[in-house]
């Protein structure tokens, strides 16, 4: 499968094993996992970091198998849902960093192209999230106000 704004192929990755239930050696209960997820979220961790901490420190290989819900669903049920989905958040942070870099280095044409690619991906993701009703229809990405968007 090709990457979006290059001619190269992406790296191949491993696939998750097909399972319908949590493994027997994972003994964490749904309540414990929910408590840890909420604590880690309040400390300022992202959903992917929460999943890695649960995997590495608490022996939970898959939150969805253990609880029946994804990390974002657990947060949504406890009124702690993020304003912006994590992949969109990361792209906005990248675009902000590139804009700051280009203010100082305005002749850096390669990173101007990187900024264009990042903002194209942002617009494409916004359109997707609006169609799936994750973001409101009137939600817009504006580079001038992007830093305010990413604060929790």
Swiss-Prot record:
The family note in this entry says:
Belongs to the universal ribosomal protein uS15 family.
Provide a Gene Ontology MF annotation, just one.
structural constituent of ribosome
**One of the GO biological process terms:** translation
* Keyword Isomerase assigned: no
> What SMART domains does its record include?
Ribosomal_S13_N, Ribosomal_S15
Instruction: Locate the region Disordered.
Output: 1-26
Task: Look up the domain of life of the source.
Answer: Archaea
**Classification lineage:** Archaea, Methanobacteriati, Methanobacteriota, Stenosarchaea group, Methanomicrobia
Subunit organization: Part of the 30S ribosomal subunit.
Q: Where is the composition biased (Basic residues)?
A: 1-10
Keywords, comma-separated and alphabetical: Ribonucleoprotein, Ribosomal protein
Which Gene Ontology cellular component terms are annotated? cytosolic small ribosomal subunit
- Output compositional bias ranges, type Polar residues: 11-26
Protein name, per record: Small ribosomal subunit protein uS15
